[in-house]
């Protein structure tokens, strides 16, 4: 499994953020796109220097860093800049790959967190390419999907309403995707055994091996 999708925020938390965004200043999303992807990006973003964006960054980071599955999957070292994006009917973002490096460091994992109620828009699915095919992801309000930044992905056209999301990038303690997945599987398996059978000397050895890897 090279991506994870789960519920991060409640509907109440999302609505609180959406209420904050009523007074936000929105700019052309192409300002933050690379030259090769700029023409295919049709959306708006909250100005990076705004206080509202900084407040949302803090809310999202605290929620992510306190979620056991996210910590296990990402082994996060740093959350880079967070963008708040609004895509209206007719907008989307053509196929692109995120930058491998940012001014604040390496970007190993990318994420999208849906703030809008799924009934507030149509279309706008996130499509991520794998080696053999593509995965089309539709997010409910408060759901987040995290995937390797090396994967080609696109936001399909929004056909009705407005899609408001947070997108961001994570630097992991492990750069290599295979290593991260192995650690995630080991941690998930060990915690599953602990929940099912309780603690044992053998399981302690598994946790010891995980810690020392």
Model-derived features: where do they sit?
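Catalytic core of non-heme Fe(II) oxygenases with the double-stranded beta-helix
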Residues: 68-184
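Non-heme Fe(II)/2-oxoglutarate
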Residues: 1-76, 81, 182-213
